[in-house]
Each structure stands twice: as C-alpha cells, then as structure tokens.
Curated annotation (Swiss-Prot):
Keywords, in A-Z order: ATP-binding, Chaperone, Endoplasmic reticulum, Hydrolase, Nucleotide-binding, Signal, Stress response
Chain intervals for the UniProt region annotation (Disordered): 607-657
Ranges for region Nucleotide-binding (NBD): 128-282
EC number(s) reported in the record: 3.6.4.10
Protein name: Endoplasmic reticulum chaperone BiP homolog
Activity regulation comment: The chaperone activity is regulated by ATP-induced allosteric coupling of the nucleotide-binding (NBD) and substrate-binding (SBD) domains. In the ADP-bound and nucleotide-free (apo) states, the two domains have little interaction. In contrast, in the ATP-bound state the two domains are tightly coupled, which results in drastically accelerated kinetics in both binding and release of polypeptide substrates. J domain-containing co-chaperones stimulate the ATPase activity and are required for efficient substrate recognition.
Gene: hsp-4
Length: 657
C-alpha cells in the first residue's frame, strides 16, 4: 500500500494568455513603467515607439541613488542625487539601504549588523525596524516601506516628466531570493507611492529579458549573475523563441558592493587608529566622508591598479591620504568574492546541468565590473567569457520595461512569455509529522496544485491544515507559514471524508491556500502575507544545506513513519473489510473471521504500545498480519471468490490529516 498516492490536480498556468486585446489593455491601464528598485541605485524605463527608453533624471543621470534626506530647519525632503550629495554634512538624517530592511524583523542578525554601520538611527517598533530622523524641529519615524515609497515616487516623477502625463502602473523588480514578506512589503511601498504594482518580477529574470529579447537562434541556456549594491542573485534560464523559463534560482539578499566598501572602510579605520591613535567611528561625518571616497576608489580600481584616497580635514582638522591598490582591495574581499560561486554551483545542480551546458553568462549589477569577480566567473566556467552586450546598471530596468509593455499590450514587444519559479518546496503536515509536498522547489509559477486528504480518526469533525516551506521530509525541520481549520465534517469512519487542499502561487509569487470538504462543501482559505513570518534568506540557505547534510537521516525517519502508517492503514482496512457482511465479512467462516480479527487487534495493540518502533519492526508486524490474512483470502479465491479480489485492497488511499 502506498501512503502518498493521489494528486488530483497539478497544472501550470501560463502568466500571459491574452495578447489579443492590446488596445483595450492600454486604454484600461495606461502607460506601465518598469522600475528597478535597487539597494544603492534605482532605474526606470518605458517601452515606447517599439523600443525601451531608459529615462534620465533631472541631473541627466540614467540611474538615481536610492537615498532620502531631510535637511535644514524646515526639514526639506531630498531624494536621489540631491540626497546623496549632502550625506557627509547631514549623515544622521540621510537614509539609504532601505532595501536591506524591507520585510525584515528588527532582531534579525543581518539587521543588527547593518545598524552598526549606518549613520541614521534604527528603532524597534514591534520587532519591525523603523528609521528615526529629524524633520525640521520634529523627530519622525519611517518604515522601510515608506522610505522605499519615497524612492519609487522619485522614479515615478522622472517617468512622468519624460512622458508628459501621469503614470499609475508599474512593474517593479526584486531579488530572486526575496521571500514573501519582502515581496509584499515592496508592493506596499508601491501603493504608498501611488503606484499600482501590476507585477513583481525577479531581477535576474528581468535582465535575461533585456539580454534575450532579440535572440532568435533556438533554445539557449543563460546564467544570469546579478551582483548589485546590496543583493546577489544567480538564475539559470532557458530562452526559446521568446519564452523565458527560469530553471533554478539562488543567491544572498545581503551581499553586494556595500559589503565590499565596508571591508575597505574597516581597514582604513584600523589603519588610521594605528597611525594617529584616534577612532574615526566617533565622528559620523568623518565616517560618511570616508565611505564616499572608498566607493569612488572601488570604482576607480575597476579600470586602474591603484588609486589615492585624499580627504581634507577628515577628523580633528587632520587630512587623510592613503593609497589603495587593486591587490589590497581584492585581498580584503576575497572571501566575499568566492562566496558568489556557491550559488552558481547550486543552480547548476538544481537544474541538473553541467558548466558546459551554459551557452551564455550575463553579468548584471555594478559590482560585476570588479575585475576579480569577472575573473572568478570566467575561471569557474573554464575560461568562458561572459557576454558584454548589456549595461549592467540598466539591464534590470530594461527587462522590467519590456515586461510592462507586454502586460500593457504595447505593440512590438515580441512574443515574450515569462515563466518564473518559487524558491522553496511548499506542503502541509500529515500523520506522523510528515511534510507532504504540494508544490516543489523551482516549480514554474504561476501554478496551482491540489491533493485529496482524509481524516486520521473515526468521527473526526475537523481537520487542521498546517502549511510549511522547506526541503526536509519532516515538518519539525521545516518552517511553518500558517494554519487554519476545516470544520463541520459529518461523522464517518477514518479515511472516508475527502478534504481537497489547493495551493496556488500567483504571478507575484504569493501563496494562497484553500481546503474544502467535498462532502459538505465547507471550506476555508489563507493567504500567506507579510503578517506571516516568512523565512529569511539565511534560513532558506540553512534549510537547503541541512537537507543535503542530513539526507540519510531524513530518509530513515521518513521510512520509519511511512512503514508505521502502512501497517496502521492495513490493519484498519482489514478491520473494516471483515466487519462488512457485503464484502469480506460475508464470505468468511467464523473460524477464519476470528483468526483475522485477533491478528488485527494484536497489530493495533502493538502499534499503541510501540510508538517509536523501527522501520524493520513495523515491516515485520505487517508481514505477521499478512501471514494470517493472505492464506485465508487466497483460500477464498480458490473457492471461486476471485470476483471479490479487489475488495481486500483499497480503491483509493489518501494521506491522513
């Protein structure tokens, strides 16, 4: 008997099925813009006149710093270049890195580490990190969503100035490894900015669209390596005649250019203290002056082998002058550079591909300009040169603009179909604490899967649907997302009621779960939103690593539970059959009936007193029960009862809740 046997519905829906009503879409939604909301810089584009336009801001720059500042006695709000330019004179009231806070909790390790380096104050509000700044004479707190909304407002204004009319709809990109809470928070930021976020898409996927739009030469496997200011993503996609299918994704939502800057900052702060005996950290302005010059030096080292960092009157009126070589920069960050290769290896494993199967390597994000990063990737792929026909700063916004054009029904966007994936396995708890999978890791989304379950006890009037994500076979090793109950189930023997559980992931990667009692029509549902504690990227990585590390233990535990479930189901099934006079019960002699009843009762009693029995012990007990049942059933067949053969076996089996 198989415990996991019935999947009623399993289908993948294409995100785009109506390209016909293009004019109707445009009139209904208006112009849809594409926004790359970055940790350090943001970028906006629009599909117009048959091509993508990356829109320059009021300073003439095609990328805009993701900075917000409040300055002067009136608390004037500055966003973008104006905010970043006054960072060194107003560090406490200049906010950046909101993307490193969005959708996170105050007590997360990464948040606590970042707080040490930021000049602005972070306060704990119900375990949500809020930014506290002076706005004129008042002290105000802003959520990360509000700060991100201010940046999105700036990007909206940049687009409106160029287009000459109001914009209400946008496609916004997020790192591939953003969890549900972070995606929801990004959508909330759009709403705060007055934008309807019609679609959230993954940054490396957007970059692949930018790269692959004009590629018509058959199926290609594309590895997108996206290393930005604060996040890192790797995605492996196939592109074939305008269909973009994400095969696997991995990354670190807390690794990027700012981490490289921080290593150099710490080096110079220690060096300065060693030479002068003074601690730069005591002066916020001095630290931000150093931060600005270190970032400039890092950029310079992408094209030259050494650069000089000179800052007038850095601390206590003293000037600062030091040389930074490319070799020193690489030494300070080599472990971080090498850490980027692990997700590359993981996506290849997940997609079941070899290095030689990758046709193109696409580099995205400003940090991929670092020569050592380029060299490590080239060496990893045995000397294969990454593609260079794409601007790493603009690629994500470019792809988002194409996607916006497709959704808006703009002509000449080409036959683009985007098939993205969810990053973790999703399932529910069944008898014995087993994680029963409904949607597997790296399944193409949007998707919808259903499975029928049943009750674990006689006359059970309610079932609890407990939802988990993770890669381990037992729920205790995975992460709980939420739970709800289906009640009002009419009294019936165990295994009879049919409860259909449906998991649906929408185009934005957000999970909706419903359950319905097929007998009564009673149903309940749950949407996993920002209020449910979704996993941090660290937890995701730990779970996947744990799943690899403890695979043998997991399998043994799973087999133990399954063997117990099989014995229990077989025993109760036989008990039901011999009690039914229309089936087996009506065909047996009294002596045979007593023999089977006694064997069944012994098995049930043994189960009750041996909760932690091994797989072998469970299997041995099942064999003992079968040794009593099978000769009697065989005797019936030979006496002409073959027509009833199927009655001894179950017609359908459902996992029990």
């Amino acid at each position: 008997m198989k415990v996991f046997s019935l999947i009623l519905i399993a289908f993948v829906a294409n995100a785009y099925c109506d390209e016909g009503a293009s004019t109707e879409k445009e009139e209904k939604m208006g112009t849809i813009i594409g926004i790359d909301l970055g940790t350090t810089y943001s970028c906006v584009g629009v599909f117009k006149n048959g091509r993508v336009e990356i829109i320059a801001n009021d300073q003439g720059n095609r990328i805009t710093p993701s900075y917000v500042a409040f300055s002067g006695d009136q608390g004037e709000r500055l966003i973008g270049d104006a905010a970043k330019n006054q960072l060194t004179i107003n560090p406490e009231n200049t906010i950046f890195d909101a993307k490193r806070l969005i959708g996170r909790f105050y007590n997360e390790k990464t948040v606590q580490q970042d707080i040490k380096h930021w000049p602005f104050k972070i306060v704990d509000k119900s375990n949500k990190p809020n930014v506290e700044v002076k706005v004129g004479s008042e002290t105000k707190q802003f959520t990360p969503e509000e700060v991100s909304a201010m940046v999105l407002t700036k990007m909206k204004q940049i687009a409106e100035s160029y287009l000459g009319h109001e914009v209400k709809n946008a496609v916004v990109t997020v790192p591939a490894y953003f969890n549900d809470a972070q995606k929801q928070a990004t959508k909330d930021a759009g709403s705060i900015a007055g934008l309807n976020v019609v679609r959230i898409i993954n940054e490396p996927t957007a970059a692949a669209i930018a790269y692959g739009l004009d590629k018509k030469d058959g199926e290609r496997n594309i590895l997108v390596f996206d290393l930005g200011g604060g996040t890192f993503d790797v995605s492996l996609l196939t592109i074939d005649s305008g269909v973009f299918e994400v095969l696997a994704t991995n990354g670190d939502t807390h690794l990027g250019g700012e981490d490289f800057d921080q290593r150099v900052m710490e080096y110079f702060i220690k060096l300065y203290k060693k030479k002068s005996g003074k601690d730069l950290r005591k002066d916020n302005r001095a630290v931000q002056k150093l931060r600005r010059e270190v970032e400039k030096a890092k950029r310079a080292l992408s094209t030259q082998h050494q650069t000089k960092i000179e800052i007038e009157s850095l601390f206590d009126g003293e000037d600062f002058s030091e040389t930074l070589t490319r070799a020193k920069f690489e030494e300070l960050n080599m472990d971080l550079f090498r850490a980027t290769l692990k997700p590359v290896q993981k996506v290849l494993e997940d997609a079941d591909m070899k290095k030689t199967d990758v046709h193109e390597i696409v580099l995205v994000g400003g940090s991929t300009r670092i020569p050592k990063v380029q060299q490590l990737i080239k060496d990893y792929f045995n000397g294969k040169e990454p593609s260079r026909g794409i601007n790493p700063d603009e690629a994500v916004a470019y792809g988002a603009a194409v996607q916006a054009g497709v959704i808006g029904g703009v002509e000449n966007t080409g036959d683009v179909v985007l098939l993205d994936v969810n990053p973790l396995t999703l399932g529910i708890e069944t008898v014995g604490g087993v994680m029963t999978k409904l949607i597997g890791r790296n399944t193409v989304i949007p998707t919808k899967k259903s499975q029928v379950f049943s009750t674990a006890a006689d006359s059970q009037s309610a079932v609890s649907i407990v939802i988990y994500e993770g890669e381990r076979p037992m729920v205790m090793d995975n992460h709980k997302l939420g739970n709800f109950d289906v009640t009002g189930i009419p009294p019936a023997p165990r295994g009879v009621p049919q409860i259909e559980v449906t998991f649906e992931i929408d185009v934005n990667g957000i999970l909706h779960v419903s359950a319905e009692d097929k007998g009564t029509g009673n149903k309940n549902k749950l949407t996993i939103t920002n209020d449910h504690n979704r996993l941090s990227p660290e937890d995701i990585e730990r779970m996947i690593n744990d799943a690899d590390k403890f695979a043998a233990d997991d399998q043994a535990q799973k087999e133990k539970v399954e063997s117990r479930n099989e014995l229990e189901a077989y025993a109760y099934q036989m008990k039901t059959q011999i009690a039914d006079k229309e089936k087996l019960g009506g065909k047996l002699t009294d002596e045979d009936k007593v023999s089977i009843e006694s064997a069944v009762e012994r098995a049930i009693e043994w189960l009750g007193s041996n909760q932690d029995a091994s797989t072998e012990e469970n299997k041995e007990q099942k064999k003992e029960l079968e040794s009593v049942v099978q000769p009697i059933v065989s005797k019936l067949y030979s006496a002409g009862g073959q027509g009833e053969q199927a009655s001894e076996e179950p017609s359908e089996d459902h996992d029990e809740l």
